[in-house]
C-alpha cells in the first residue's frame, strides 16, 4: 500500500488506498485481507479464506483445484497428453520455448489458472474494495496468468431484462504496466463547486482498483507482515 500510494502521489493523484487483498499462488490458493490498515483475522481466525470459494469451471469443487501447483500440472497433462509429472517450472520453461514440450498446452495451463483465480478474486474484492497483490511460487509465470485474470475480473454480467454491465462496480488495472498505471493514477478527477459558495473541491467519480505482483517474494512479505502485526499489538 505505501508503495502504490507513493506512486500515486508522485503522479499527482489525490487517490489513496487503505485496503488490500494479498494472494499467494503456489501449493494452494491463500489470501490475507487488510482493512483500513488492520489485518482482518475474522471471528474464527478464518478471514481471507479464498481457497474454498466455488470453482468456476467445476462448481462441485473448490477453486483451489484450479488455482494451485497441482492444477497447472493437471491441465498441462490433460491438454498435452504428456503423462510425465512435469513441474510448474518445467511447464513454464516449455511455455517460454526453452524446453521441449507442448507450448500451447503450457501457456493454456497458466491461463486457465488466471481465469479461475480472476473469478474468485472478483467475488472477494467486491466485498473488500481495495488493491490486490499477488505472490507465491507460481507468480513467476505472471506474463501468462495476469492477462486471463484481468480479463475475467473485467468481464461483464447482466440482468434478466437484458442490461449488461461490469461484474465489478470498478475497473481493474494492471499496476505493473506503465501505461495501465498512468490511466489508474489519472482517473476522472474533476473540480466541483460547493453549493452556496465560490469554493471548488476535487472529486474523482472513477471507481478503480489494481493488481500488482509482489516484488519482494511471498516469504519476505509474510515475514514483514508478521513483524509489523506484532509491533502494532505491543501496546494493546
Protein language model features and the residues they cover:
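Conserved phosphate-binding catalytic cores of ATP/NTP-utilizing and phosphoryl-transfer enzymes
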Residues: 1-20
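A short acidic/small-residue loop/turn micro-motif
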Residues: 42, 46-49
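Short glycine-aspartate micro-motif
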Residues: 20-24, 133
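Gly/Ser-rich catalytic serine loop of serine hydrolases
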Residues: 24-32
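ATP-binding/phosphotransfer module of carbohydrate and carboxylate kinases, centering on a glycine-rich
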Residues: 8-14, 55-236
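Short, active-site-adjacent cap segments at secondary-structure transitions
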Residues: 1-3, 30, 139-142
Amino acid at each position: 500500500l505505501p508503495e502504490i500510494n507513493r506512486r500515486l502521489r508522485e503522479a499527482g493523484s489525490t487517490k489513496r488506498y487503505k485496503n488490500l487483498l494479498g494472494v499467494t499462488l503456489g501449493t494452494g490458493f491463500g489470501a490475507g485481507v487488510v482493512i483500513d490498515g488492520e489485518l482482518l483475522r475474522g471471528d474464527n481466525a478464518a478471514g481471507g479464506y479464498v481457497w474454498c470459494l466455488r470453482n468456476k469451471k467445476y462448481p462441485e469443487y473448490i477453486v483451489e483445484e484450479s488455482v494451485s501447483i497441482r492444477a497447472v500440472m493437471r491441465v498441462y497433462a490433460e491438454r498435452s497428453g504428456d503423462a510425465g509429472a512435469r513441474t510448474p517450472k518445467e511447464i513454464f520453461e516449455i511455455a517460454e520455448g526453452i524446453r521441449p514440450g507442448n507450448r500451447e498446452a503450457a501457456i493454456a495451463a497458466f491461463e486457465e489458472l488466471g481465469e479461475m483465480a480472476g473469478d474468485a478474486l472478483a467475488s472477494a474484492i467486491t466485498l473488500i474494495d481495495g488493491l490486490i497483490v499477488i505472490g507465491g511460487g507460481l507468480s513467476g509465470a505472471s506474463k501468462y496468468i495476469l492477462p486471463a485474470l484481468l480479463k475475467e475480473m473485467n468481464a461483464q454480467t447482466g440482468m434478466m431484462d437484458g442490461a449488461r454491465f461490469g461484474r465489478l462496480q470498478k475497473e481493474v488495472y494492471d499496476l505493473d504496466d506503465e501505461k495501465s498505471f498512468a490511466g489508474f493514477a489519472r482517473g476522472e478527477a474533476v473540480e466541483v463547486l460547493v453549493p452556496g459558495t465560490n469554493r471548488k473541491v476535487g472529486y474523482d467519480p472513477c471507481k478503480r482498483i489494481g493488481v500488482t505482483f509482489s516484488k519482494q517474494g511471498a516469504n519476505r512479505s509474510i515475514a514483514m507482515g508478521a513483524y509489523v502485526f506484532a509491533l502494532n499489538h505491543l501496546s494493546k
